[in-house]
Amino acid sequence: KEVGGHARHPLERYVVIEELLAAGAPGGAHWIADRQTAPLILRYGSEEAKAAYLPGICKGEIHTCIGLSEPGAGSDLAAVRTSARHTPEGWRISGQKIWTSGAHMSHVMLALVRSEEGSERNAGLSQFLIPMDAPGITIRPIIDMGGDHHFNEVFFDDVLLPEWAMVGTRGQGWAQATAELALERSGPERYLSSHVLMTALIDAA
């Protein structure tokens, strides 16, 4: 409530999303923000991050995306090469993400990056909140076979972030990311959105 929400139970969110989808409402842009990013910020985020992002997420004004997959790594999330380098000014992010859903419509990316030089696999990873309008970010669309634009490549060229942009504990990004991903299938969005589309196709046939 202190950041503009209603402190309601997750099952109540489930019911609201169910009704929105049943009515065909366009709620997809906000799913990641309220379902995954906000709970992670509440649990692990700095006070500055909570103040910067949670009120806007509660109002539906801030949309987020998740920066996980990278080129050449397939579905191996432990193969992250995008780096976070600590400097006197803050953190410098360099690298690339791919297959990022909705990056072109998002205000913030929650990214899993390698913060410890020389670390391997799931060790030495941290999570950062990256404003998508920050200098040094380039977004390139990936157009699917149907001509739609949903996925993106995102490039980071020495993107500067403040200290508070790190979410949680340095080097504990893997544990935090797996906890966050447990929320990804916590709602009815996937199957109900498909059901609405299937019904529309049947009606149009």
Language-model segment annotations:
Residues K1-A51, P55-G60, S101-V108, S194:
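Internal helix-loop-helix
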Residues T82-R85:
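A structural signal for short hydrophobic beta-strand segments in well-ordered beta-sheet cores
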Residues A22, G136-A205:
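Glycine-rich beta->alpha junctions and the first turn(s) of the following alpha-helix
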